Amino acid sequence: MIEKDFVVEGLRRTRIDEYLEKELERAGYGGMDVQVTPMGTMVVVYAERPGMVIGRGGKTVRAITQKLKNKFDLENPQVEVKEVDVPELNPKIMAHKIAAMLQRGMHFRRVAYTTMRRIMAAGAQGVEVTISGKIRGARSATAKFTDGYIKKCGEPSVKHVREGFATVQLKPGVLGVYVRIMPPDVVLPDKVEIEDPRVTETPAEEASEASEVVEDLEEVEDLEEIEDLEEVEDLEEVEDLEDTEAEKKDADGEESEK
């Protein structure tokens, strides 16, 4: 049945992931991806320190390849190692770092807050750290720490939120560490962005045409002012003529009276 094949393949991938996590814990194991190709099975391993995965002269990666072929029945397995760009945004790596700090005897609250600050400083939108086990006394308890914004349910939670888990053995008992991180590049479906109004700049040609129009208007205004001045001068000449004629008439009247 097809359903059974899917279940078997899922179980095999889970077993491979657990095996690689155990073998490459010191290398900062950050997850894996299995790709089936016509040439064989490509296993991509993500690690914080790829050199430790490859080993001296490729010894470690050859041993892992042989183990994947014999133990997990992978056809012609090819192991490719990739470095994790930002380890603080990988929940598997951060969960193992928390487990290592707890094993060194650090207080769980200090460990959680220090880790969350590092994750948020790397640009994450939100983070949730859960530590469960005998953290306070003889009885088991759970402490949950959150920072930022993180989806808890629905498709965005399954699709976008990354999860990582690690365990650590202490004297009181086993502690479980669960880390959930929402990366910075996640765009949620209910997010609305309001853009500022766009200011269109006037092209150079339109600006030159506008300046020419302004110059033409200034020339027209200058011409109108000149015409007004000429009209004023003509009026002054007419008034001068009228004054001289009036003076002549007054002089003629005085002579006739004499």
UniProtKB/Swiss-Prot annotation:
It comes from Methanothermobacter thermautotrophicus (strain ATCC 29096 / DSM 1053 / JCM 10044 / NBRC 100330 / Delta H). SMART domains: KH (SM00322). Keywords: Ribonucleoprotein, Ribosomal protein, RNA-binding, rRNA-binding. The keyword Transit peptide does not apply. GO terms for biological process: translation. Residues 203-245 have a biased composition (Acidic residues). InterPro entries: KH_dom (IPR004087), KH_dom-like_a/b (IPR015946), KH_dom_type_2 (IPR004044), KH_sf_prok-type (IPR009019), Ribosomal_S3_C_sf (IPR036419), Ribosomal_uS3_arc (IPR027488), Ribosomal_uS3_C (IPR001351), Ribosomal_uS3_euk/arc (IPR005703). GO terms for molecular function: rRNA binding; structural constituent of ribosome. Gene3D superfamilies: 3.30.300.20, Ribosomal protein S3, C-terminal domain (3.30.1140.32). Binds the lower part of the 30S subunit head. Belongs to the universal ribosomal protein uS3 family. Part of the 30S ribosomal subunit. One of its GO terms (cellular component) is cytosolic small ribosomal subunit. Residues 198-258 are annotated as: Disordered. The keyword Cell cycle does not apply. It comes from the Archaea. Residues 16-85 form the KH type-2 domain. This is Small ribosomal subunit protein uS3.
